[in-house]
Regions:
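Short intracellular "coupling" helices and adjacent cytoplasmic loop segments at the cytosolic face
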Residues: 1-4, 93, 101-125, 129-131, ...
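Juxtamembrane loop-to-helix connectors within ABC transporter transmembrane domains
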Residues: 9, 17, 49, 84, ...
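Transmembrane helices of ABC transporter permease
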Residues: 19, 23-36, 73, 77, ...
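An intracellular "coupling" helix at the cytosolic face of ABC transporter transmembrane type-1 domains
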Residues: 22, 112-113, 129-138, 142, ...
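Transmembrane helix-loop-helix hairpins at lipid-water interfaces of multipass membrane proteins
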Residues: 24-83, 87, 161-165, 276-280
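Helix-loop-helix
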Residues: 59-65, 158-175, 242, 246-315, ...
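ABC-type nucleotide-binding domain
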Residues: 322, 329, 336-582
Length: 582
């Protein structure tokens, strides 16, 4: 990470800390109390040593008093450290919670193009793993950095009070450890950043494989998947080992420096005792302070190394937060009301990639209650057209109108609530069957829910489930067949009954008998509602009012089933290829 970017990351972290200024101040005060009490103990210890070795009889009364003071200081230090750790946990976990909430909210505001371009595993890794890594480093910083810096300042003050010249030796030699730590941390940060990126790749790959494990097994792709996994795993191991290597040599290198400092202080101190400049007790206190002075440097170098990992993780989260959200609703956007189903596309152009046009000069006018079937080869723009109708993407040129309103001038919520969708890929949330059917209408009554299930021909199999409508569905509906999942998705739409419908390959995964029952249910559902139907099996769209035959983003043919067969064109060829006798 470049220096400027690292500074910006640090500045943004500070912004997240601002709401918890009081807690941070409390942590700082507790750190000062803890350090002050800790540093007072060597003074008492030195006095105790002088009390024992002084000429004449040992002053036991004073010695006992000193021991009591030491015990009290140790007890108060432990209490202050416990409170400080509790406060630090509050700060870091709250910052992590705030960051995770913001990241998840921002993810929902991102355009579909961003989500399509990134694996779900990478996004999960940024929101979960990277934020955990960041808060772990932040917690370590609060816990050890505060006390470390205060301890260094405090010990210098106490040592100056005992002997300024020996203190000068300590202060002069100490910066060498910082040079060593800085040299190593620059190299470790790059490795931690690559480790974080590779961890995200691994999460995405494992998530993809587990989500499609049946397909992997069917195509005997296990060995190839294992090779891909091994490659990612090798990369992760390489970057992890390199990061660990650089971080692991920081502490030994600095410890070596501090051992030299300690030895130098011991020699200089002994000479001072011989000259009578300081007492043996003061030397004992000074050596204790030297040890306490060097110890925070060891901890701080460890914190710096860990903080490199934390910064790398935070940078990945901020990359997500910096992505431009989808174009917000216009300030004067109005909610669609009294939607009857008038839809019009005027000279629409669209492409996912600027250089590769997909839909060009597309025109279509749909009257309320019409059933518009869209057919054509893969990649002709059928699903893209649905994405544009729902405003998952905005058109490049032209406009789409609903009830005479440009959909860019109405709220997305009112537009999308006007459509009911049965997608090619079914989606069910982890929860009960009841919760899934009522997903679009949480306030539905029991009678309404059961009626919707019956109309979708789902009531029968639901009743046979162990707990009926209260049966728990696993993530993605793993304990249901593909047909059952699709029936529940259809029941969900049956319950809300919006004024317009989008059926994208709605029955492509259902057996023939179930398809016939669903087609009958669809007839009831689509009556009086504008419906857009996409299907490869032409048997599902023969009753459509208008069939659009698309190719390369253009309408090749348009008409009813009978009219298009009579033309003996593209639709007729497609129909004959599916229904011609073998």
């Amino acid at each position: 990470m470049k220096k400027d970017k690292k500074q910006k990351t640090l500045q943004r972290i500070m912004e997240y800390m601002k709401p918890y200024r009081f807690l941070i101040f409390a942590s700082l005060v507790l750190a000062v109390i803890s350090v002050a009490l800790t540093l007072y103990v060597p003074i008492l210890t030195g006095q105790g040593v002088d009390c024992i070795i002084s000429k004449g009889n040992v002053d036991f009364a004073r010695l006992i008093s000193i021991i009591k003071m030491i015990v009290i200081c140790i007890a108060l230090t432990a209490a202050a450290q416990w409170l400080m750790n509790h406060v630090n946990n509050q700060i870091t976990y709250k910052i992590g919670k705030d960051l995770r909430i913001q990241a998840f909210e921002h993810l929902q505001k991102l355009p579909l193009s961003y989500v399509d371009a990134h694996s779900s595993g990478d996004l999960i890794s940024r929101i979960v793993t990277d934020i955990d890594q960041f808060t772990d480093g932040l917690l370590l910083g609060f816990t050890q950095l505060f006390t470390g810096v205060i301890t260094i300042i405090g010990t210098i003050c106490f040592m100056l009070g005992i002997n300024p010249w020996i203190t000068l030796v300590v202060v002069i030699l100490s910066p060498f450890s910082f040079f060593i730590a800085s040299f190593i941390s620059k190299r470790s940060f790059n490795m931690f950043r690559k480790q974080s990126q590779t961890r995200g790749n691994m999460t995405g790959f494992v998530n993809e494989m587990l989500g499609n494990i049946k397909v992997v097994k069917v195509f005997d792709h296990g060995e190839k998947a294992q090779e891909e996994f091994d490659q990612i795993n090798d990369d992760l191991a390489y970057y992890s080992l390199r990061a660990t290597f650089f971080s692991s040599i920081t502490n030994p290198a600095t410890r070596f420096m501090y051992s030299g400092i300690y030895a130098g202080v011991a020699i200089a101190g002994c000479m001072s005792v011989i000259r009578g400049s300081i007492s043996v007790g003061q030397l004992s206190s000074f050596l204790s302070y030297t040890n306490q002075y060097t110890k925070p440097f060891n901890e701080i170098t460890g914190v710096i190394t860990e903080f490199q990992n934390s910064l790398a993780s935070a940078a990945r989260v901020f990359e997500l937060l910096d992505e431009e959200p989808m174009i917000p609703d216009a300030k004067d956007a109005k909610a669609l009301q009294d939607v009857k189903g008038n839809v019009e596309l005027e000279h629409v152009d669209f492409s996912y990639v600027k250089e590769v046009p997909l839909i060009q000069d597309f025109n279509l006018k749909v009257e309320p209650g019409q059933r518009i079937a869209i057919v054509g080869p893969t990649g002709c723009g059928k699903t893209t057209l649905i994405n544009l109708l729902m405003r998952f993407y905005d058109v490049n040129v032209g406009m789409i109108k609903v009830e005479g309103n440009d959909i860019r001038d109405v709220t997305r919520e009112s537009l999308r609530s006007s459509y009911g969708m049965v997608l090619q890929e079914t989606w069910l949330k982890a929860g009960t069957i009841r919760e899934n059917i009522c997903y679009g209408k949480p306030d539905a009554t029991e009678e309404e829910m059961i009626m919707a299930a019956k109309e979708a021909n789902a009531h029968g199999f639901i009743e046979r489930m162990p707990d009926g409508y209260d049966t728990i569905i696993t993530e993605g509906g793993g304990n249901l067949s593909q047909g059952q999942k699709q029936l529940l998705c259809i029941a969900r739409i049956m319950l809300s009954l919006p004024p317009m419908l989008i059926l994208d390959e709605a029955t492509s995964s259902i057996d023939t008998m179930t398809e016939l029952r669903i087609q009958k249910a669809f007839e009831t559902m689509m009556k009086g509602r504008t419906s857009f139907i996409i299907a490869h099996r032409l048997s599902t769209i023969q009753n459509a009012d208008v069939i659009l035959v698309m190719e390369n983003g253009h309408i090749l043919e348009q008409g009813t089933h009978e009219e298009l067969l009579a033309k003996n064109g593209a639709y007729a060829r497609l129909y004959n290829s599916q229904f011609a006798p073998v």
